[in-house]
Structure formats: C-alpha cells, structure tokens
C-alpha cells in the first residue's frame, strides 16, 4: 500500500521525520509530497526542501520525495496511493485534519486518511515554531536535522548557538559590552 505524506515542510522538522519513519514501517512505500503553493512565501524553495528531505530520509529505502501542486487527492490518484498520512499533535489538529479528511473523501472515495499521533517529544513542534525561534536567534539544533539547522541559520544570518560541552544547553554567544564606571 502506498501512502502520501503531504505538506509544505518549510522546514521539515524532527517531528515530521519521526512520522515519516513510523509511516515507513506501516506502508510499502511513503511518498513525502512537498506542496508547491504560489500563495505562500517560503523560507526555502521547493527544490531546496526536496533536497533537505532527501538527505534526511536517505536511510529509509521505501521513502520517496516529490513535489506537487493542486489537490492532494488528485496527486494521490496520479501516484496510485491509497492513503494520505497525517500527523496529529493536539485536539486542535484533529478538528482541522478531520474536516480535511471528510472533504478529501467527497473528492475521492478510493483514498483513506490515516492519522498518527505525534510522539510526545514533538507534540509542540511545527515548522513555524522552528522559523520563529531561528528568526530571533534561538537554537533549533534539537528541532531539525543538523544540515537543515545550518541552512536555517544561514537564512537568518545567525551562527549556530554555541553549545556548552558539559550541559549541552545552548549558550548565547558573548557580546562586547562596554561598562562605564563612575569616578
């Protein structure tokens, strides 16, 4: 059985990758499908995202990476997929995803939506959270693969926050601070 895991993946996170890995154990093939959405201004181009995802999933032989535009169900039919794979982080995700699943069912009765609960450690994680943290100079090293973290830091002209080798907690780089003393 072929499953499509659609999304913008801008950027792909460890939460997405956890879902892909788990899906790859459930389905014969998982196609990670990057949506080309002309109405959004992404951090990374579709081509960059495809390459980032390929590097992140190269150890999974039954995972393929592709891009598409238009309706997800049309793409799924074109790829002969029977399942749309979706992750659920919270109840709010469920409401939106359930509506989408019902809508997709009205468009194609041949395609089922399968929901996987996000692993606890990624239940808060989204691409927008990663972008927001990085934009303000925070460490995202624990949220995305290393090669993607570097790409993101470059987009925001930040260096990777230095890690304390003892505690592995992010330590902000020291800044030159001049202190004036009263005489």
From Swiss-Prot:
It is found in: Cytoplasm. GO terms for cellular component: cytoplasm. One of its GO terms (molecular function) is pantetheine-phosphate adenylyltransferase activity. Substrate binds at residues 8, 40, 72, 86. It comes from the Bacteria. Its EC number is 2.7.7.3. It catalyses: (R)-4'-phosphopantetheine + ATP + H(+) = 3'-dephospho-CoA + diphosphate. The record marks 16 as: Transition state stabilizer. Pfam families: CTP_transf_like. It is an enzyme of class 2 (transferase). CDD domains: PPAT. ATP binds at residues 8-9, 16, 87-89, 97, 122-128. Pathway: Cofactor biosynthesis; coenzyme A biosynthesis; CoA from (R)-pantothenate: step 4/5. Belongs to the bacterial CoaD family. Homohexamer. This is Phosphopantetheine adenylyltransferase. The gene is coaD.
